[in-house]
């Protein structure tokens, strides 16, 4: 089932310029390819052309040709696309049509008037392929993120399509579930010989299993069509703002030259003996870092317990504290209870048991509004927080609610916008901003209120590496220069490793660890319990037989932090 784009371009109806430009790409039957690129590069648009959403659901101007199995798709009806291309979306909830898993998998067969006896055996066989055969009576909406993806996958496998398209399948998954998803996709690819196309930001996670080719896109064009080894041996990832595997960053920091023949796409195949001396010398340059923790407690949580349904606890007896000026992470798999902590601190829900004190004051004595003056929360999606048309008015909203006079409001808003690098946009409409800039507006709105604690819920969600690095470097600067206390809630292991100093780990509604981040990340048993995984930095240290794994990881963190600080200084000078 060959796919071929020839001189293919596409322009959205509402835009002046094309989003895809002169795409020439051939994907052979049975290949597994990955499409990567920064936000706005055109990779998702390319996927929508492949599955027929463009031009059937999304209108625009198409030029050039797209053929599937030698057939020109310009004349395809929508059903002809769906008979050949099955798509698993990032938002799996939007794909469910049945009340039970069995009904959802059977949907396509019912449309084809398949006999019940045949349908039953096909549904059972397909469910078994994705390890769901014991769950056919359950509602898909009651499942975890990884289980939901398997239901969506089964729904297209039962239709026996030849091409499987995955649009950012790892975006909402915790590390262990994401790893399992890549393994399931790989198993299906090897067993069925289907053509697999994966659109994804998280390149290192996708490379957990073999892929044939990687397509790098930027500005609506194909920049590179190459093997994983060729791409990772080149400077293209850094040039186009794509996060490279952590082990490669560490090796390059030590001055190790990585050639194509070294197989840089696979840590297990790298000739690490060749780099042993360079890595040892690099590590011996390390200065002993002591993350000084201030003795003054800002947030004190004791025996926090909460249940959404009165039966199963979302949190059970959780206790921890956050010192003033710390940069802390709360880790855990999807559904572990970590976001419940944010809701309890905000006052959106009240605990069944336990206490929360901020700067010595019992939060239960404060209203939601009063808490919002002390605790600033940045949600995953900035569009859920924004309520005004203009940037200035959005940042001024909280101050005006406090009854400040307009001159005070003006001065404070300009100060917050300047701090967030948005002062030149103060008279702009919010719709004109990028996703990352909108996030900065929400942060500016919170900083204007001078909160004592800043909490960010999954700050990397929906952002590519370049955008989220820019935002987190900014948050790091606020923490370093203004002493703002920051708590990040995430399951992005790279983010937590590079930016935070201490990790609070939640698993199955309970606190299982509260320790320096390097201690947590060098404890495979603990990470496994929390449905997290060790990073490739830890794997590299282990394979190099580093006796002090924690110190090795800390040195890497210090080097990266110094590099970020140096780049910030250079930008300020420029």
UniProtKB/Swiss-Prot annotation:
<feature type="binding site">
    <location>
        <begin position="37"/>
        <end position="44"/>
    </location>
    <ligand>
        <name>ATP 1</name>
    </ligand>
</feature>
<dbReference type="GO" id="GO:0043190">
    <property type="term" value="C:ATP-binding cassette (ABC) transporter complex"/>
</dbReference>
<feature type="domain" description="ABC transporter 1">
    <location>
        <begin position="3"/>
        <end position="244"/>
    </location>
</feature>
<dbReference type="InterPro" id="IPR015856">
    <property type="entry name" value="ABC_transpr_CbiO/EcfA_su"/>
</dbReference>
<dbReference type="InterPro" id="IPR003593">
    <property type="entry name" value="AAA+_ATPase"/>
</dbReference>
<dbReference type="GO" id="GO:0042626">
    <property type="term" value="F:ATPase-coupled transmembrane transporter activity"/>
</dbReference>
<comment type="similarity">
    <text>Belongs to the ABC transporter superfamily.</text>
</comment>
<dbReference type="Pfam" id="PF00005">
    <property type="entry name" value="ABC_tran"/>
</dbReference>
<dbReference type="InterPro" id="IPR050095">
    <property type="entry name" value="ECF_ABC_transporter_ATP-bd"/>
</dbReference>
<keyword id="KW-1278">Translocase</keyword>
<dbReference type="Pfam" id="PF12558">
    <property type="entry name" value="DUF3744"/>
</dbReference>
<dbReference type="GO" id="GO:0005524">
    <property type="term" value="F:ATP binding"/>
</dbReference>
<keyword id="KW-0067">ATP-binding</keyword>
<feature type="binding site">
    <location>
        <begin position="332"/>
        <end position="339"/>
    </location>
    <ligand>
        <name>ATP 2</name>
    </ligand>
</feature>
<keyword id="KW-0677">Repeat</keyword>
<dbReference type="GO" id="GO:0016887">
    <property type="term" value="F:ATP hydrolysis activity"/>
</dbReference>
<keyword id="KW-0997">Cell inner membrane</keyword>
<keyword id="KW-0547">Nucleotide-binding</keyword>
<keyword id="KW-0472">Membrane</keyword>
<dbReference type="InterPro" id="IPR017871">
    <property type="entry name" value="ABC_transporter-like_CS"/>
</dbReference>
<comment type="function">
    <text>Probably part of an ABC transporter complex. Responsible for energy coupling to the transport system.</text>
</comment>
<dbReference type="InterPro" id="IPR003439">
    <property type="entry name" value="ABC_transporter-like_ATP-bd"/>
</dbReference>
<dbReference type="InterPro" id="IPR022216">
    <property type="entry name" value="ABC_Co_transporter"/>
</dbReference>
<feature type="domain" description="ABC transporter 2">
    <location>
        <begin position="299"/>
        <end position="533"/>
    </location>
</feature>
<keyword id="KW-1003">Cell membrane</keyword>
<dbReference type="InterPro" id="IPR027417">
    <property type="entry name" value="P-loop_NTPase"/>
</dbReference>
<protein>
    <recommendedName>
        <fullName>Putative ABC transporter ATP-binding protein VVA0347</fullName>
        <ecNumber>7.-.-.-</ecNumber>
    </recommendedName>
</protein>
<keyword id="KW-0813">Transport</keyword>
